[in-house]
């Protein structure tokens, strides 16, 4: 019997679920808005809310707890600097889940989860490392060496 068990399994193992929510939390805090399935968005909401509350609490212990979950120094710094300041007057309710229709391939319910009072400029930030652009000096050095 499954009486009183909280949370959804989402059809994956526990380790996969933990990794998935880690990745989704990092993406949400970086872009401040992501699109995913409705059950995943509903399960991600308390994770994100607790992370923002950790950021508001501040201190070394809270920073280490956030880093243990996120494992991304840049996102932890954003969480404790800009997001903590943005939500210092708000007592919870830092995210919203908006239904976004159905996915074409399998008709899964889709949703947009976003931070309340989000920064529109954060949407669509580059997800990967910056590609190195060869400068004129590098090209001249390579030509001379050849």
Swiss-Prot record:
State the Pfam families in the record: Ribosomal_L17
GO molecular function terms listed in the Swiss-Prot or TrEMBL record: structural constituent of ribosome
Record's InterPro entries?
A: Ribosomal_bL17, Ribosomal_bL17_CS, Ribosomal_bL17_sf
**Disordered as annotated region, ranges:** 118-146
Instruction: Give GO terms for biological process.
Output: translation
GO cellular component terms, alphabetically, are: cytosolic large ribosomal subunit
Transmembrane residue ranges: none
Tell me the keywords, alphabetical order.
Answer: Ribonucleoprotein, Ribosomal protein
Instruction: Report the family membership.
Output: Belongs to the bacterial ribosomal protein bL17 family.
Per its UniProt record, what PANTHER family does this chain match? LARGE RIBOSOMAL SUBUNIT PROTEIN BL17M (PTHR14413:SF16), RIBOSOMAL PROTEIN L17 (PTHR14413)
Q: Please give the subunit comment from the record.
A: Part of the 50S ribosomal subunit. Contacts protein L32.
Cited HAMAP family: Ribosomal_bL17
**Entry protein name:** Large ribosomal subunit protein bL17
Q: Give the originating organism.
A: Acidiphilium cryptum (strain JF-5)
Q: Which gene encodes it?
A: rplQ
């Amino acid at each position: 019997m499954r009486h009183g068990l909280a949370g959804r399994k989402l059809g994956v193992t526990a380790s996969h679920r933990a990794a998935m929510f880690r990745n989704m939390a990092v993406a949400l805090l970086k872009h401040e808005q992501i699109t995913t399935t409705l059950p995943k968005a509903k399960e991600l909401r308390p994770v994100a809310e607790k992370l923002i509350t950790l950021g508001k609490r501040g201190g070394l212990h809270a920073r280490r707890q956030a880093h243990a979950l996120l494992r991304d120094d840049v996102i932890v710094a954003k969480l404790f600097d800009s997001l903590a300041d943005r939500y210092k007057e708000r007592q919870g309710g830092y995210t919203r889940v908006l239904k976004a229709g159905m996915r074409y391939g399998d008709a899964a319910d889709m949703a947009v989860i976003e931070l309340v009072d989000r920064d529109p400029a954060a949407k669509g930030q580059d997800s990967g490392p910056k590609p190195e652009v060869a400068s004129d000096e590098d090209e001249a050095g390579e030509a001379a060496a050849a």
